[in-house]
From Swiss-Prot:
It catalyses: L-methionyl-[protein] + [thioredoxin]-disulfide + H2O = L-methionyl-(R)-S-oxide-[protein] + [thioredoxin]-dithiol. One of its GO terms (molecular function) is zinc ion binding. PROSITE patterns: MSRB. The keyword Oxidoreductase applies. InterPro entries: Met_Sox_Rdtase_MsrB, Met_Sox_Rdtase_MsrB_dom, Mss4-like_sf. GO terms for cellular component: cytoplasm. The active site is at C136. It comes from Vibrio cholerae serotype O1 (strain ATCC 39315 / El Tor Inaba N16961). Residues 25-147 form the MsrB domain. This is Peptide methionine sulfoxide reductase MsrB. The gene is msrB.
Length: 147
């Protein structure tokens, strides 16, 4: 659902555009903080309840830390109680890449930025009735741009 705060036209303007942003680790080490490199490039996870965007309630768009591609809208953010920012959907399906993740003895679906392959978090099928999905995203993998 798109409210008046973020118009459908505005979301259409930030639709995924193919970018050649698959850069070597050396590039990312120089341009990211140590924590952002660990999470975004090495598929790490920030500690639960530690992210600066967890309790953000401002209106705007959430962009990829690595390439600034728009990924999520505040309209789709909700408090899942899991300790990480949660969304019921991305701004559109093309901005997210889905990968099977069998690490840590679990079966999960990893989510990555489709433009630069940055690790964002995971998606689970225990979300709200709107979509049934919970996109559980590390705060450090996102930059928030207030409307």
């Amino acid at each position: 659902m798109v409210s008046e705060a973020i118009s459908k036209k505005e979301i259409e303007r930030v639709k995924f555009e193919s970018k050649d942003l698959h850069k070597p680790d050396e590039y990312w080490r120089e341009h990211l903080t140590e924590e952002a490199f660990y999470v975004c490039r090495q598929q790490g996870t920030e500690a639960p309840y530690s992210g600066k965007l967890l309790h953000n309630k401002d209106t705007g768009l959430y962009h990829c830390t690595c390439c600034q591609s728009a990924l999520f809208s505040s309209e789709n953010k909700y408090d899942s109680g899991c300790g990480w920012p949660s969304f019921d959907a991305p701004i559109n399906e093309q901005v997210i890449r889905f990968l099977d993740d069998f690490s840590h003895g679990m079966v999960r679906t990893e989510i990555r930025c489709a433009a630069c392959d940055s690790h964002l978090g995971h998606v689970f099928e225990d979300g709200p009735k709107t979509t049934g999905l919970r996109f559980c995203v590390n705060s450090v993998s996102l930059i928030f741009n207030k409307k």
